[in-house]
Amino acid sequence: MTDRQTDRQTDRQTVIKLCQYVFGFVNVKLSEIATVSRGGSFQKKDFCDEGVPCIHYGQIYTRYGISATKTIQFISEDIAKTQKKAVTNDIVMAVTSENVEDVCKCVAWLGEEDAAVSGHTAIIHHNQNAKFLSYFFHSSLFFAQKKRLAHGVKVIEVTPDKLLNVVIPLPSVEEQERIVDILDRFDTLCSDLSSGLPAEIEARQKQYEYYRDKLLTFTAKE
């Protein structure tokens, strides 16, 4: 990054913080707070019992939640040398799926080690609260945008570069932390009810989704 690019980035962050102070939040494009890159190329056949932590796009749909500090699988150090990595606080997003509902499912990587990331993914490197962004990417606010970005018939895809145009209502980092704390409690409560009656589970899940979307919707200060 050149000195001029660094100055522009600093100016942009200053404007964002000023708007957050005045209005309580600011609508920003993902490109203003993050960079997006594609994942690597390892496959399931490369999995091993120990080695370098790795996140495979297929497991983001089925095995991961909002965030993770440990991976489910590993790959060897030799294979990992040529792979793309997610560092702590990055968002790893699966950008292909069989349906619009599941495409762009993501996980905030909070592990201490870098994690190798498979293909069919986007690695979002940013300067915000990772879990806040992960919750946003699971919300109806994002769903409406990704429907416009998605393309394909049998395989639905969102091109990683197009994610940069996603608009996010962004409060201050302190407010992001407060929202994450509340949503984490809801998430834990829903998980604790996972062995209950189906109707009860569904009702609590809908309640959780409602409050999640409300917490991620902002109005300007008067």
Task: Go through the PLM ranges and name each one.
Residues 8, 19-39, 200-206, 211:
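Non-catalytic DNA-recognition/assembly elements of restriction-modification systems
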Residues 33-43, 59-90:
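Sequence-specific dsDNA recognition surfaces
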Residues 19, 24, 41-42, 79-80, ...:
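Short, solvent-exposed loop/turn positions at domain surfaces
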Residues 56, 81-140:
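A short beta-sheet element
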Residues 25-30, 52, 86, 90-92, ...:
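Short, structured motif recognition centered on aromatic/hydrophobic residues
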Residues 114-120, 151-172:
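A short glycine-rich beta-alpha junction/loop motif
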